């Protein structure tokens, strides 16, 4: 079953008198349980596609479907609910709440979602070497540590879809591989649809499919 689908999606914007096509007409889907990567040069439209897929920005035309429901037909409050309940975002900037400790970052997810403590999320903290940092504030963490906390936070809510924009950018090689292995495991064992934008071609071996984005046009990469 398709967890996420883009139908005839385009994105353009005005730059003075010129119209820039950030994303040319795109048809793209990811099934549950699949882990796909999108590669391509900077400025090619990868992040634009990801933010549209997650409903963080609207397309100029076309449709976004999340688990069989048309996302862009919903009002913003309903879209926000779908984003929170169905999608885990891992962005290049960790966007942690500056006045909350690592532990409280995760407790905030529990509070908003009215959920019980997520044991799997706490296990992820240990797996990523963060268990001794739970009482630290973001300013006390390195860039790589903040990014790893953001990854755990994104997975903590047990979303059905994971959208990761350069999730390993600030990590060393060992931790980068560990994160990608976790994303692959989440896809396979928990039947999640996962899309990862990356520049690191060493990491795509863990993916089921690899897509190439060039000049706003997406195509499946065939070796």
Give the predicted meaning of each segment:
Residues 54:
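Helix-to-loop junction immediately C-terminal to a conserved catalytic motif
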Residues 62-70:
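Conserved ABC transporter NBD signature motif
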Residues 71-88:
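ABC ATPase NBD coupling module
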Residues 100-107:
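Short coil-to-helix segment of the ABC ATPase nucleotide-binding domain corresponding to the Q-loop/switch region
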Residues 137-141, 145-147:
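Conserved ABC ATPase signature
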Residues 156-160:
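A short, proline-enriched helix->beta-strand linker immediately N-terminal to the Walker B motif
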Residues 162-165:
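Catalytic Walker B motif of ABC-type/P-loop ATPase nucleotide-binding domains
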């Amino acid at each position: 079953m398709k967890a996420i689908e883009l139908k005839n999606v385009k994105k353009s914007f005005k730059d003075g008198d010129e119209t820039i096509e950030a994303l040319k007409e795109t048809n793209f889907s990811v099934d549950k349980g699949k882990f796909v990567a999108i590669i391509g040069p900077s400025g090619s439209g990868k992040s634009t596609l990801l933010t549209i897929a997650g409903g963080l920005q609207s397309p100029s035309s076309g449709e976004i479907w999340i688990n069989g429901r048309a996302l862009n037909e919903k009002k913003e409050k309903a879209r926000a609910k779908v984003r929170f309940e169905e999608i885990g975002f891992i962005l290049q900037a960790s966007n942690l709440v500056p006045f909350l400790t690592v532990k409280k970052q995760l407790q905030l997810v529990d509070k908003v979602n009215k959920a019980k403590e997520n044991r799997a999320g706490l296990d992820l903290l240990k797996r990523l070497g963060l268990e001794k940092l739970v009482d630290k504030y973001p300013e006390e963490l390195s860039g790589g540590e903040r990014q790893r906390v953001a990854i755990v936070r994104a997975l903590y809510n047990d979303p059905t879809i994971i959208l990761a924009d350069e999730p390993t950018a600030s990590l060393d090689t060992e931790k980068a591989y560990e994160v990608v292995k976790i994303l692959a495991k989440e896809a396979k064992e928990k039947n999640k649809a996962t899309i990862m934008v990356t520049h690191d071609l060493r990491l795509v071996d863990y993916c089921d499919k690899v897509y190439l984005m060039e000049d706003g046009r997406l195509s499946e990469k065939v070796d």
